[in-house]
Amino acid sequence: MDARAREAAETSGPGLPLAVRELLAGGVAGGVAKTAVAPLERVKILFQTRRAEFHGSGLIGSFRTIYRTEGLLGFYRGNGASVARIVPYAALHYMAYEEYRRWIILGFPNVEQGPVLDLVAGSIAGGTAVICTYPLDLVRTKLAYQVKGAVSVGFRESKPSEQVYKGIMDCVKTIYRQNGLKGIYRGMAPSLYGIFPYSGLKFYFYEKMKSHVPEEHRKGIIAKLGCGSVAGLLGQTITYPLDVVRRQMQVQALSSSSLVGRGTFESLVMIAKQQGWRQLFSGLSINYLKVVPSVAIGFTVYDSMKVCLKVPSREETAVAVLAEERSNTAPIPSS
């Protein structure tokens, strides 16, 4: 941005730097969206990781099992770690997206202003956020995987189910004690392989869909919810098998998985051979129910928070960045 535009962006709003306001907007959006779909996220993880107690029980049956054995709070098991992860993750993700977008425009002023720019900036931002917050995602999965109390397995008698970790800190300490730093980042490779296309496609489809909405309706909540829903749906469908691989790698120590020590794509092939290709899409229907409101709520809350915190729009940012580039490259008039 030029000096005047930068100063206006930095000082407008509640007296906070622009980057901090972007972090706040992203963090709030992530926390609200994640909590709204926590029960579906819990069941999806149990399906992905093939808990015997939930195999073939379906969505409603799984809800009943969780409620019977763990009560209402069982639907939110692991959500503390999930929110603890998603708030910094979403904050970094959205802020990094805005920053990378500005850097690309500044570094390549001739680049086309459109969804392709959002695809590139979103992909890099997603990778940045994953690397910074992955340990909390691992903890969230391990806490959600364990089931408290006795559960019924088919026609067999109820049996106690293991509860290895007592909470977030206990989980982190146990993982580090048993496997060191490597254990804390187990399964990050498929996360990165998945997040680069998913994050990029999510921003790409969102901005692409918004570009087809009439200008007078573009800032409405309904339009944002609709565009966000389609963006999340398409992005998740394309990258979902890698999410299944990641979950199974994360809980392999608890489930005696044959994936121990194997790479991402080797694990992908093994799951398809041993568990069937359908397992690569296990929980996808639940994920559709989760992703549609989650991404829609996330984008809507983020855009609304940007308005409340007076964060410049992407169009205003692009104009300011290009103005700065022109001012820096303008020839100095001769005296």
UniProtKB/Swiss-Prot annotation:
Instruction: Enumerate the PROSITE patterns for this protein.
Output: SOLCAR
One GO cellular component term, please give it.
mitochondrial inner membrane
Highest taxon, organism lineage: Eukaryota
GO terms for MF? coenzyme A transmembrane transporter activity
Positions annotated as Solcar repeat: 17-103, 113-212, 219-308
Q: Does the keyword Repeat apply?
A: yes
**Cell compartments where the protein resides:** Mitochondrion inner membrane
Membrane topology type: Multi-pass membrane protein
Key words, A-Z: Membrane, Mitochondrion, Mitochondrion inner membrane, Repeat, Transmembrane, Transmembrane helix, Transport
State if Transmembrane helix is listed as a keyword.
Answer: yes
For this protein, the parts annotated as crossing the membrane are: 12-32, 75-95, 119-139, 187-207, 225-242, 280-302
Please give the biological process terms from Gene Ontology that the record holds: mitochondrial coenzyme A transmembrane transport
- What does the UniProt record say this protein does? Required for the accumulation of coenzyme A in the mitochondrial matrix.
Q: What is this protein called?
A: Mitochondrial carrier protein CoAc2
Q: Which gene encodes it?
A: COAC2
